[in-house]
Amino acid sequence: MSTLSRKQQTQKRHRRLRRHLSGTADRPRLAVFRSNSHIYAQVIDDAAQSTLCSASTLDKDLRTSLTATGSTCDASVAVGELVAKRALAKGIQQVVFDRGGNLYHGRVKALADAAREAGLQF
């Protein structure tokens, strides 16, 4: 019996999730990708295979406000607020949350809570 690495476990969970999650034009998918140092969020219309809006810790809007010594959860909150603001500006109010195989905890949960507080419904 082989053991999977943590990254392989995440990829396996993501494949399992994606079988059931898809975004439409009415209710696109809010996909979250978490790396060791950054977090990315995209609002995706899977039917048209297009990204409607996105935000990450590498955005010019956030890079200046986030400090290198700041908390990664604080950065996730800022990304969640920014992606929600951009989605609402495009008229998107409801999304399907795709945690990307990550556990709903920590940075992923902070991003989701911030997006909800900023006005996205999921």
From Swiss-Prot:
Q: Mind telling me which InterPro entries this protein's record contains?
A: Ribosomal_uL18_bac-type, Ribosomal_uL18_bac/euk
Gene transcribed to yield this protein:
rplR
What domain of life does the UniProt record list for this protein's source?
Answer: Bacteria
Q: How does it assemble?
A: Part of the 50S ribosomal subunit; part of the 5S rRNA/L5/L18/L25 subcomplex. Contacts the 5S and 23S rRNAs.
Question: Where is region (Disordered) located?
Answer: 1-24
Q: Which UniProt keywords apply?
A: Ribonucleoprotein, Ribosomal protein, RNA-binding, rRNA-binding
Q: According to the entry, what is the taxonomic lineage of the organism?
A: Bacteria, Bacillati, Cyanobacteriota, Cyanophyceae, Synechococcales
The record's function comment reads: This is one of the proteins that bind and probably mediate the attachment of the 5S RNA into the large ribosomal subunit, where it forms part of the central protuberance.
Biased composition, class Basic residues, residue ranges: 9-21
Q: What is this protein called?
A: Large ribosomal subunit protein uL18
Organism of origin is Synechococcus sp. (strain WH7803)
One GO-annotated biological process of the protein: translation
Q: What family does the entry list?
A: Belongs to the universal ribosomal protein uL18 family.
Gene Ontology cellular-component terms for this entry are: cytosolic large ribosomal subunit
From the Swiss-Prot or TrEMBL record, what is one GO molecular function term?
A: 5S rRNA binding
